[in-house]
Amino acid sequence: MTPQLQPKQMHWARADSSDFGGQIPAPRSGHTAVSIGKSKVVVFGGFADKRFLSDIAVYDVENRIWYTPECNGSGSDGQAGPSPRAFHVAIVIDCNMFIFGGRSGGKRLGDFWMLDTDIWQWSELTGFGDLPSPREFAAASAIGNRKIVMYGGWDGKKWLSDVYIMDTMSLEWTELSVTGSVPPPRCGHSATMIEKRLLVFGGRGGAGPIMGDLWALKGVTEEDNETPGWTQLKLPGQSPSPRCGHSVTSGGPYLLLFGGHGTGGWLSRYDVYYNECIILDRVSVQWKLLATSNEPPPPRAYHSMTCIGSRFLLFGGFDGKNTFGDLWWLVPEGDPIAKRDLVPNVDSDSKPSNVTGGAQHSASQESQAGESPMIDLAKRLGISLSLEASASFVDEINDKELIELSSMLFGESPPTGDQHACIQALRDHWTSIPANSIQLQELGPLLRDYQRLILRRYLENSFTSFYEKEVHRFFHLKNASELRMDDIPILLMEYGKLLST
């Protein structure tokens, strides 16, 4: 049974010792974790401490214990199972887990393996037909209970946009011939079968840009009787920012997207790692930001998210500096796990012993801020905010840069007693101009006034009436250099809404 997401009633909780017995998996990223029916979750491979991994860790759902099974089998080179690897694909059909590709060292892999989880036996499968080239960072999904569809990846020289279908009974690979427009080649994307369509989101593309587009592929099932073809989907709502290395997990009428790696900035580019939950509502066909309570996990990419009944289990990942080994639950508000106290701080147990430093912003840093409304709002919005940023907000009357900008734009200095009129004129200006007319020197004061209005609304309203209806994308930014060109229209739109209410 597929878990049912409850969009306004989900709760984050870091797993503790009462949740599991046995030895939990070592920290890693680029691994896979798949659910085998309702009984177990199987973790395979990954990368940590400059090593590629080939171990298997299994979570027994009923007994709530982690264990390492004794696997046997043989491959073409006499090995008992797949070589160490990361950034491979893993797909489940019945009790079998299928593994393809990945990377080990500087080598891209093209071997194909099956693990029978009833008897814990590996088999290297020799396919025939249109064999896919070795690759990493591909994405794949099961088609019913017999076939696998795989799209894209990176072969070490180029990004890929090919589509392959593997029949797990005959072991025949078929490259799908697609007519019409096709998505740009990519790797690090997600691919999910929804009824008769393969949905592909995001990834890193040719020349390195990170993408945020959504595509649907028809004609992948025999029942379709349709010519295979791609369609780009542009859905309403709170769409995810461009990213790669994210996870997409099915939850009834929803798809749950978590985490990933993107870039930020306008004047200069820098890496960004995400930790928000965004859902694709298949009923209303739109994106929605999932409201969650409690402090979320640190931002990360190349993690795993699996569903266990009505719960989702997050494991591992990487944030540009740290490799995580923590386990987190995302559960409905009525779940017993949701009734626990606040999540404990992220500590060194989340990472390999030779990795130091915290995530982007730790809970311990936030606790030092006491009862600051700014920090409280940031925690409720599920974002990180530096203590410096939380202390930098002043009333608009005391914002000298705001007053000086108004004088510069309108050509005269207002009398000391008319500063309110000066500020109002500037706000009217920002709510009336098109995004392409705004000047570079306006962005800093605009962003600061936008954040000031959000904080003021939070202080004047209860959390429920304020938070559940509003999403503010730029509240967490430290300065305007983190804005991108395509952020400006959205910033002006949100700013106008704040002023109108």
Curated annotation (Swiss-Prot):
Any one biological process term the GO annotation gives: intracellular protein transport
Gene3D superfamilies attached to this UniProt entry: Kelch-type beta propeller
Keywords: Golgi apparatus, Kelch repeat, Protein transport, Repeat, Transport, Vacuole
Ranges of the Kelch repeats in the UniProt entry: 40-86, 96-145, 147-196, 198-247, 254-310, 312-357
Residues making up the signal peptide according to the UniProt record: none
Cellular component, GO, one term: protein storage vacuole
Tissue distribution of the protein: Highly expressed in leaves.
Annotated knockout phenotype: Accumulation of proglutelins in seed endosperm. Mistargeting of dense vesicles (DVs) to the type II protein bodies (PBII) protein storage vacuoles and reduction of PBII size in endosperm. Formation of paramural bodies (PMBs) secretory vesicle-like structures charged with DVs in endosperm.
InterPro entries: Kelch-typ_b-propeller, Kelch_1
Biased composition (Polar residues): 351-370
Location relative to the cell: Prevacuolar compartment; Golgi apparatus, trans-Golgi network; Protein storage vacuole
Listed PANTHER family: ACYL-COA-BINDING DOMAIN-CONTAINING PROTEIN 5 (PTHR46093), RAB9 EFFECTOR PROTEIN WITH KELCH MOTIFS (PTHR46093:SF13)
Subunit details: Interacts (via C-terminus) with VPS9A.
The protein's name in its UniProt record: Protein GLUTELIN PRECURSOR ACCUMULATION 3
The species this protein was found in: Oryza sativa subsp. japonica
